[in-house]
Amino acid sequence: MQTQSLPTDSLPASSALRSVAVDKQDFRDAMARLGSAVNIITTDGPAGRAGFTASAVCSVTDTPPTLLVCLNRSASVYSVFQQNQTLCVNTLCAEHESLSNLFGGKTPMEMRFSAARWSTLVTGCPVLSGAVASFDCHITQVISVGTHDILFCQAAAVIHNDDQHGLAYFDRCYHPLMRQSR
């Protein structure tokens, strides 16, 4: 895994980063209005099995199929993901709200994983049964920004479930996303 910091000295002078006073709480409150899918990110490998809830996940490109996951370097699971170099992004369905809370708290790992059914695909990372979608990935690049690492993850396998409704997080609350009939 290659780690690099965001280069600011290579920006043209006209687009150089300026110091702007943005209140931390105002920023967090505004970001709470940015709705997103709820995901459980899992890993398993030489460093052990771990998982956490994340909404900071998005597509990067489909060639090669790559997405990104943001992970706080102070998170208890950070070193496990860093050492294993593989992960699975499990996008939750509406019925997974309590599972999201388990993986988002201080619950011991064994209790988190015992609350659901899991399988594996290519990397050996836990794949959540009943997830809306699961992306089984290798971590190919890491960029450090502030308190977080941005993990670029290339999908080795993908599955999706057309029978489930999604789960979103908006304004610090869960919201079910209903699939429209086609």
Curated annotation (Swiss-Prot):
Transmembrane segments: none
Keyword Transmembrane: no
Catalytic activity annotation: FMNH2 + NAD(+) = FMN + NADH + 2 H(+)
A GO molecular-function descriptor: FMN reductase (NADH) activity
Pfam families listed in its UniProt record: Flavin_Reduct
Entry annotated with the keyword Protein biosynthesis: no
E.C. number(s) listed in UniProt: 1.5.1.42
Keywords assigned: Flavoprotein, FMN, NAD, Oxidoreductase
Broad class of enzyme this protein falls into: oxidoreductase
GO BP of this protein: nitrogen utilization; uracil catabolic process
PANTHER family: FLAVIN REDUCTASE, FMN REDUCTASE (NADH) RUTF
Protein function: Catalyzes the reduction of FMN to FMNH2 which is used to reduce pyrimidine by RutA via the Rut pathway.
Family: Belongs to the non-flavoprotein flavin reductase family. RutF subfamily.
HAMAP family hit by this protein: RutF
The protein's name in its UniProt record: FMN reductase (NADH) RutF
